[in-house]
Design a protein with these regions (language model features):
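Hydrophobic alpha-helical membrane-embedded or membrane-associated segments
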Residues: 29-37
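Soluble "head" domains of membrane/secretory-pathway proteins
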Residues: 2-27, 39, 43-49, 53-232
Length: 232
């Protein structure tokens, strides 16, 4: 009878040790998953929400895009530079980038021209190296008026050579977009990645809607037909 407490103590110790091993395994699993998520977020892909109507009808405000960071080369955190990518930005790509003067502002625009190319806009028509560039399939113009180059660069832009290491980016909603026609060329180091596919889409709530009403109205605001749309 004197051995029973000893046996019970050993069993208790074994149970305690087994529980400790399970906790340790759980910790390492959590740590591994967390590290993988961090690597994917910083170096591979993440979601980007389209904030405005400047890319209609290609994109809609409230679209959530899969942002491919790997292709152009992911930016390292803390301003440590950019890793080599799989390819370069090309004309026609949908590029997500930071405004150089305000990195907190992140936009998506279409690349029209790259380093060394000359961009000119004549009465809303875009030319690159003297050749007329066809409008993207879902681009649009909402204002039939033509503004002179002396008053605005929206519809008329004198020949502009894109500097080395820079890009000329324009919104598909040509009459309702602030882009390289206003800011000039965007440095390639400001590029975060390229938009690939619409992962989710929801129509922004009305300004006068309360938070509770917007929650109740959420299912009707989801654009189900846009989910899975590949960008072009």
């Amino acid at each position: 009878m004197g051995k029973k407490p000893v046996q019970g103590g050993r069993a208790s110790a074994r149970r305690s040790g087994g529980w400790g091993k399970k906790r340790l395994k759980g910790f390492w699993l959590w740590l591994t998953v967390s590290m993988v998520m961090v690597v994917v977020y910083f170096f591979v892909a993440t979601l980007y929400r389209v904030p405005s109507r400047a890319m209609e009808n290609t994109l809609r405000a409230g679209d959530y895009l899969l942002l491919d960071k790997l292709h152009y080369g992911p930016q390292l955190p803390f301003g440590l530079g950019t890793l080599p990518g799989l390819g370069k930005v090309e004309a026609g790509d949908l590029v997500v980038f930071q405004i150089p003067d305000d990195p907190s502002r992140v936009y998506i625009k279409r690349c029209i021209a790259t380093s060394g190319q000359v961009v000119e806009i004549i009465n809303k028509a875009t030319f690159v190296d003297g050749i007329r560039v066809a409008d993207p399939p879902y681009s649009k113009y909402i204002d039939a008026r033509i503004r002179s180059g002396s008053n605005s660069t929206r519809d008329n832009l004198s020949p502009f050579e894109v500097p080395e290491g820079s890009l000329f980016l324009i919104g598909d909603n040509r009459d309702n977009s602030r882009d390289s026609r206003n800011w000039g060329a965007i440095p390639q180091q400001s590029v975060l990645g390229r938009g690939l596919v619409v992962m989710f889409s929801v129509r922004p709530k009305e300004e006068e809607q309360s938070r509770w009403d917007s929650i109740l109205d959420f299912p009707s605001r989801v654009r189900w037909e846009r989910i899975g749309t590949w960008l072009q």
